[in-house]
Amino acid sequence: MSVYPECTWLLFVCLCHLLVSAGGSLLLPCEPINETISVEKDGCPKCLVFQTSICSGHCITKDPSYKSPLSTVYQRVCTYRDVRYETVRLPDCRPGVDPHVTFPVALSCDCNLCTMDTSDCAIQSLRPDFCMSQRASLPA
């Protein structure tokens, strides 16, 4: 038996390990990024589109092969750690409608459990700049 098949197998295993290690470092970490978002509300005919900081990136998760009905699996997602709140004014709102909308600005992010009260935890959601009504932009 030749020594080459064993060396080939060892080389294959080493290359697979390197590719897996490199692949993990190519994923973007969970951190604040600049993103175009939109805000709108009932009684205001225009959707306001602007840039802000949101949390985005990869969090290491584990999904067990065996899922026991007695245990709970917790998946970590990239979510806000520290935030600052800013307020914008929507244009052309009807009389009696408060034109102000307050939104979080990401100062730092963390891989943590998804909080449904403050985050969109859907598997697939709308783009952050999706508008149902006519678009308007913040003045430069």
Swiss-Prot record:
Heterodimer of an alpha and a beta chain. GO terms for cellular component: cytoplasm; extracellular space. This is Gonadotropin subunit beta-2. It comes from Anguilla anguilla (European freshwater eel). Belongs to the glycoprotein hormones subunit beta family. GO terms for biological process: G protein-coupled receptor signaling pathway. Residues 1-24 form the signal peptide. Gene3D superfamilies: Cystine-knot cytokines. GO terms for molecular function: hormone activity. The keyword Transferase does not apply. Disulfide bonds join C30-C78, C44-C93, C47-C131, C55-C109, C59-C111, C114-C121. Glycans are attached at N34. Keywords: Disulfide bond, Glycoprotein, Hormone, Secreted, Signal. The keyword Metal-binding does not apply. It is found in: Secreted. Involved in gametogenesis and steroidogenesis.
